[in-house]
Regions:
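A short, well-structured beta->alpha microelement
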Residues: 17-19, 61-63, 133-137, 189-199
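Short gly/pro/ser/thr-enriched loop/turn and capping motifs at secondary-structure boundaries
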Residues: 43-45, 109-113, 134, 159-160, ...
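Class I SAM-dependent methyltransferase SAM-binding "motif I" and its flanking Rossmann-like core
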Residues: 85-147, 200, 204
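Class I S-adenosyl-L-methionine
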Residues: 1-105, 112-113
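A contiguous loop/helix-start segment that scaffolds small-molecule binding in enzyme catalytic cores
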Residues: 3, 7-11, 76, 146-218
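Short hydrophobic/aromatic-enriched beta-strand-loop microsegments
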Residues: 52-59, 100-105, 122-129, 172-179
């Protein structure tokens, strides 16, 4: 069991992007924080906060030690995008500090919003993140073969064109794909494609794609 901290580390899910999707519970913890830890994008949402700010980039493991140290006499809130339980920094913190020293505040994930936008349920979906990960396309293909719904977090390296080419190479051209860009933001865009046409689409940044096997669900 981890040593008990004076102040619990608060891990807050900030939602898919827009402040209007952040819960009131999350906002209150952030308002009361002495220290905010998060990515530059998330910290920029709270420029008016008087809390001391620590930027999270590739310094994950080193920063955990700092967070634990700061929690001895300060209220530390760690900001994560979406929901803390969905491909986030939360697991590293909980594993290191112990759940007895943490409070995890859920948020709305980009995947939840993506499924809401296309009017589909997500309780029967398979989820995968390619964000910042390499060599995972074979695993993606396996999951697409095994599941009728697969939601994927993409990035510039693992982009939709690359995924479309891989699906075609593997004989999976009959899938329907929704590309969900800038979810909750002003430039939000939801588009539907077949695999062949998706090869011609240029999509940048972090996005959610939902791959559907419509034939199996009929």
């Amino acid at each position: 069991m981890a040593k008990k901290l004076v102040n619990k580390i608060i891990i807050v899910g900030c939602g898919p992007g827009s402040m209007k999707f952040m819960t009131g519970h999350a906002s209150q913890y952030i308002k009361d924080a002495d220290v905010l830890v998060g990515s530059r994008r998330l910290l920029s949402l709270f420029q008016n906060s008087e809390a001391v700010k620590y930027t999270l980039n590739r310094n994950y493991k080193q920063l955990i030690t700092r967070i634990i140290s700061l929690s001895k006499n300060k209220s530390v809130v760690v900001l994560v995008s979406g929901d803390p339980g969905f491909f986030s920094y939360a697991k590293l913190i909980v594993d290191k500090a112990g759940i007895e020293n943490c409070v995890v505040v859920p948020g709305i994930s980009s995947v939840q919003l993506a499924f809401a936008r296309i009017g589909r349920t997500w309780n029967d979906a398979c989820f995968m993140s390619l964000h910042g990960r390499t060599g995972r396309l074979a695993e993606l293909i396996r999951r697409v073969r095994e599941h009728e719904k697969v939601a994927v977090l993409t990035d510039n390296s693992n982009n939709v064109k690359l995924i479309a080419r891989k699906l075609l190479d593997e004989g999976l051209k009959e899938r329907k794909i929704y590309v969900c860009e800038n979810l909750s933001l002003n430039k939000e865009r939801i588009r539907e494609f077949d695999v062949t046409s998706l090869q011609r689409v240029q999509v940048k940044g972090l996005n959610v794609i939902i791959i559907l096997d419509e034939e199996s669900s009929e």
